[in-house]
Regions:
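Divalent metal-cofactor coordination and adjacent catalytic microenvironments
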Residues: 1-203
Length: 203
């Protein structure tokens, strides 16, 4: 099981970029457009669709993965992996323990948590979700994690195209038509194709 515990602090595409793509003139004061609220809702919707389609995290966000037991090689979903914040487990007595970082290594290239040399995993109680791994994922840009230059340009282009499709079909969106029914845009899929993660978590 996996859950996102912290959403991205901002979006890969700004309102100004979306306006430019949609050819919406800023006509209000301060510079605004009557559809700004709608576009601001469509941007995260488009980003989430593209993240789900590729199996990636675009901007820095926090995830938790819950496992029934430790494994020697644990691949973390929704790459790229930035860092592992903590690993907790339920011991044989039923108490929650924090695992020392000396027991494992983190490979941010392959998005994996590995057992460190000479170490052994602690015993866990035989219950569901006995192990919880909390980690940061997303395109990291050092001191400025929300710097959009860390996002591949093809992904930004796909999000903008998705925003455009959602905006053009906003009546269908409001009527509840699903993205999968509406999104036949082969260009979006072609742009995202190189960034898709396979079912084993490989990139």
């Amino acid at each position: 099981m996996m859950i996102r515990t912290t959403d991205p602090a901002s979006e890969p595409v700004t309102l100004a970029e979306a306006r430019l793509h949609l050819k919406l003139d800023a006509s209000g004061s301060p510079e605004s457009h009557p559809d700004d609220d709608l576009v601001n809702r469509l941007i995260p919707a488009a980003r989430e669709w593209c993240e789900t389609y590729t199996g990636r995290s675009f901007f820095e966000q926090t995830w938790q993965v819950k496992l029934d037991e430790f494994k020697d090689d644990m691949r973390l979903p929704r790459p790229p992996l930035i860092s592992v914040t903590s690993i907790q487990y339920i011991d044989l007595n039923g108490d929650t323990q924090a695992l020392s970082s000396s027991v494992y290594t983190v490979d941010t290239v392959s998005n994996r948590v590995l057992l460190a040399y000479g170490q052994t995993w602690p015993s866990t109680r035989s219950v569901e979700n006995a192990v919880t791994i909390t980690y940061q994922a997303g395109y990291d840009s050092g001191n400025s994690p929300q710097d959009d230059t860390a996002i591949p340009s093809a992904i930004k282009a796909a999000i903008l195209l998705m925003v455009g499709s959602l905006y053009e079909n906003r009546q269908e969106v409001m009527a509840g038509l699903s993205f999968s029914e509406m999104m036949g845009n082969s260009t979006v899929r072609s742009l995202l194709g190189p960034y898709m993660v396979d079912k084993y978590g490989s990139v």
